[in-house]
Each structure stands twice: as structure tokens, then as C-alpha cells.
């Protein structure tokens, strides 16, 4: 019975994401960066050279490689992608509080735990599908422009980036549960990500910050060994957001 109800809630989330165009927007974002990143890596040296041409300025720009395309994709997603994910996720629960959908559903025999779990899981699945689209697009265009390409290496980098974005989503959904409206939830999520970035520069404690995952993806590009601490820190953040999110929502009075 609970399994069937959970699947119904998941289906409701997917339907809502489609109707609200959140699914299309996130897919479009990853598709866009999947195309633009290899293009930027390939043609940026030529653009810079043409800009300084005739100005008696000499700039030595190394020839772009497929690693530059991957690095550009990671940079784009970890900056603009994070901002867009926060915007799309900040209303996950807060929006339904505002329009009364949450109150309507909870009048029925719907478990609050399953309600929140369906929110987290559906968002994670949406992110995974979007990442897959971005991954395949980068692979295609990098193959076209650079020829050689390490699929396994990029898969590892994409997995690290996915974990980082799951952290972003988890924090945003947590504040969406905590807050009454969307805007404060988004602001708090953004401030928390900034705080995690500041924590990452601290000594022994900072190495556990999820913000270090972006650095780990760059380390993998250069074929160096990665550190496990940011992964442990990310797992703790995700579990805490889900656990405390469920706990707070149990006490929410519709």
C-alpha cells in the first residue's frame, strides 16, 4: 500500500514538473551548457587572439584540448547551473504550502514522510536525467571538435558534479520545507552554499565541505588522486537535509 502511494506521489511530482516547465527548463540548461562548453573551449583562443590583433600585444595561448571542454562544462554548471537549480527547487514544498496543495493532500491518508521523500527523490531523478542529457551533449560536441576523448574520465567527473548538485538540491528543498514562501527558501539556500564555500578554506574542517567537490573534479581531469573527505561531507549534508526536513514537516500545521 505504501509503495503504491509513494509511486503515485512520485508520478504527481513528475506531472507537476512537466506542467510547470521545470523539467523542460532544467533539460534546456544542461543541453545549452553541453553545447556551449566545447564550443567555448575550442574557439575562445581564436576569439582572444583576434581581439588583441593589431594592438602590439602578444599573448601565448596554448592549444585547446578536450580537457578544456570538460573543465568549461564543470565551471558553467557549478556556477550558473547551481543558481538555476536553486531557483527551480526553492518552491518544491513552499509553493504547495502557498497554494494550499500540501494542505489538501495531507487531509487524505498521505504519509508526511512519503510526501517529503517523493519531493527529494523526484528532484534527484530530474537532475540525473538532465545531467545525462548534458553528459551526452558534451561527449558528442567534444568528439566533433577535439576527436580524442576519455569517456570514463568524464563519467567520473560527471558523477562528482552530480553529487555536488544533489547537495545543492537537498539544501534548497530543506529550506523550502522550513520556510513559508519560496523567496526566503532560495535566499537561505544561496547563502548556505556561499557559507560552505567559505568553510572550505578552513583547515582540517574545511576539507569536508561539499564545495571541494568542484576541486576534486579538476583533480581528476589532471589524473591525480582524489580525496574522500568532500564526499563524506556531502553525504552527511544530504542525509541531514532529508532527515531534518522530514522531521520539521511532521510538525508543520497546515
Residue spans for each PLM region:
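Helix-loop-helix units of permease transmembrane domains in multi-pass membrane transporters
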Residues: 92-124
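Short hydrophobic, aromatic-rich alpha-helical segments embedded in or entering the lipid bilayer
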Residues: 5-8, 204-222
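Central hydrophobic cores of alpha-helical transmembrane segments
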Residues: 26-31, 184-196
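Juxtamembrane non-transmembrane "cap" segments at the membrane-aqueous interface
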Residues: 47-53, 192-212
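Junction motif at the cytosolic side of a transmembrane helix
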Residues: 236-254
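Secretory targeting signals
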Residues: 30-87, 91, 117-183, 219-236
Amino acid at each position: 500500500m505504501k509503495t503504491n502511494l509513494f509511486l503515485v506521489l512520485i508520478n504527481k511530482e513528475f506531472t507537476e514538473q512537466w506542467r510547470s516547465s521545470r523539467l523542460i527548463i532544467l533539460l534546456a540548461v544542461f543541453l545549452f551548457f553541453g553545447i556551449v562548453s566545447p564550443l567555448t573551449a575550442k574557439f575562445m583562443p581564436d576569439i582572444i587572439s583576434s581581439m588583441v590583433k593589431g594592438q602590439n600585444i602578444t599573448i601565448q595561448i596554448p592549444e585547446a584540448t578536450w580537457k578544456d571542454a570538460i573543465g568549461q562544462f564543470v565551471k558553467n554548471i557549478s556556477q550558473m547551473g547551481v543558481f538555476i537549480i536553486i531557483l527551480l527547487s526553492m518552491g518544491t514544498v513552499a509553493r504547495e504550502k502557498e497554494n494550499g496543495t500540501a494542505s489538501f493532500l495531507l487531509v487524505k491518508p498521505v504519509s508526511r514522510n512519503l510526501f517529503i521523500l517523493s519531493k527529494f527523490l523526484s528532484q534527484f531523478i530530474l537532475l540525473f536525467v538532465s545531467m545525462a542529457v548534458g553528459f551526452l551533449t558534451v561527449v558528442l560536441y567534444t568528439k566533433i571538435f577535439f576527436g580524442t576523448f576519455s569517456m570514463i574520465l568524464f563519467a567520473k567527473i560527471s558523477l562528482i558534479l552530480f553529487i555536488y548538485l544533489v547537495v545543492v538540491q537537498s539544501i534548497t528543498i530543506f529550506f523550502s520545507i522550513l520556510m513559508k514562501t519560496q523567496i526566503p527558501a532560495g535566499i537561505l539556500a544561496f547563502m548556505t552554499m556561499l557559507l560552505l564555500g567559505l568553510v572550505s578554506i578552513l583547515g582540517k574542517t574545511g576539507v569536508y565541505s561539499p564545495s571541494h567537490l568542484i576541486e576534486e573534479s579538476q583533480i581528476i581531469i589532471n589524473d591525480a588522486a582524489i580525496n574522500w573527505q568532500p564526499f563524506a561531507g556531502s553525504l552527511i549534508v544530504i542525509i541531514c537535509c532529508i532527515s531534518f526536513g522530514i522531521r520539521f514537516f511532521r510538525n508543520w500545521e497546515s
